[in-house]
Amino acid sequence: DQGAGVTYLEPSASQIGHKESIKDTARVLGRMFDGIEYRGFGQDVVEELAKYAGVPVFNGLTNEFHPTQMLADALTMREHSDKPLNQIAFAYVGDARYNMANSLLVLAAKLGMDVRIGAPKSLWPSENIIETVQAVAKETGGRILLTENVKEAVKGVDFIHTDVWVSMGEPKEAWQERIDLLKGYRVTPELMVAAENPQVKFMHCLPAFHNRETKVGEWIYETFGLNGVEVT
């Protein structure tokens, strides 16, 4: 939309980290482009690209963080609330070990927001992430709560976030385990009411398994009897 020239290198068209080192790839791409966005799995890959590219490198998504999504989410919450960012409260419910929960914690800590994580303790973010964001929140006035009680997590919030329960690349066998652990953390009309805020809004980074209208959604319904998984 802004007139930039964009080149997309799909996985099959790149030898990064396979036949060519990340360091060498970074140096070559940095000579050809003014910026690089990396979307993949390893956080170490995007950090090594940033170290050697010599141009700005943007993290489009890794297993650990999703900062570009946070730019969109912060804008969306600001657009759909009459409060300044540091007065907005939001919850994340579900599997909190990966990029969305981690990044929402970082977002809230840096902007002084009120964030609650509602998840089984076995699916909480790592201790390192928690300690890091708590230290930042002390400086910014951010409020961070981690709880296994989903109703405590959503009480009074302006937004409820979630994400898929099984991430890219995980086997089908993971579904049974996650459903058993997380069935009490689905975003349902009842959970929205539990926020006790008639203006509460739902957010999801997408794609969402919210019905049977996909092959995976239909398989989940036939296998587990769920019409919608993390959200109904």
From Swiss-Prot:
The record marks E79 as: Important for structural integrity. GO terms for molecular function: amino acid binding; ornithine carbamoyltransferase activity. Gene3D superfamilies: Aspartate/ornithine carbamoyltransferase. Its main location: cytoplasm. GO terms for cellular component: cytoplasm. It is an enzyme of class 2 (transferase). Belongs to the aspartate/ornithine carbamoyltransferase superfamily. OTCase family. This is Ornithine carbamoyltransferase.
